[in-house]
Amino acid sequence: MPTPSMEDYIEKIYSLIETKGYARVSDIADELFVHPSSVTKMVQKLDKDEYLIYEKYRGLILTPKGTQMGKRLLERHALLESFLSIIGVDPSHIYHDVEGIEHHLSWNSIDRIGDVVQFFENHPDALKTLKAMETNKPETKE
């Protein structure tokens, strides 16, 4: 199993490849706000663990294992953003909150959250009831 840090890299690499068609060490460093040398070390580890194939100065490609994991991690992130949005979390907090919790939930928990999101998507009246509950509560300050 990849560590939370490895997951962040795999997710970002997958996202870059999906949007740009490639992911370079410098792109990954810019996106994750880390030094290129840190990216190189992690990319070498991900290569060793068979999530990607890395050749110095030539770039990297995700293996099928890395592609599958990257897709799953990106979907997890999007699902958690949807869930937090549905339950009424302030949009300005959603990204940060997802970053804080995504590595601490089991895949079983993620699947159950997916069920909740799907329920509210399929039952707009239930979503209206939830939103009504939200508007009847006093606002909390942070």
UniProtKB/Swiss-Prot annotation:
SMART domains: HTH_DTXR. Residues 1-63 form the HTH dtxR-type domain. One of its GO terms (molecular function) is protein dimerization activity. GO terms for cellular component: cytoplasm. Mn(2+) 2 binds at residues 11, 77, 99, 102. Mn(2+) 1 binds at residues 8, 99, 102-103. DNA binding is strongly activated by Mn(2+). Keywords: Activator, Cytoplasm, DNA-binding, Manganese, Metal-binding, Repressor, Transcription, Transcription regulation. Pfam families: Fe_dep_repr_C, Fe_dep_repress. It is found in: Cytoplasm. It comes from the Bacteria. Its main location: cytoplasm. GO terms for biological process: intracellular manganese ion homeostasis. NCBIfam families: PRK03902.1. Homodimer. HAMAP family: HTH_MntR. Central regulator of manganese homeostasis. Belongs to the DtxR/MntR family. This is HTH-type transcriptional regulator MntR. It comes from Listeria monocytogenes serotype 4b (strain CLIP80459). The lineage of its organism: Bacteria, Bacillati, Bacillota, Bacilli, Bacillales.
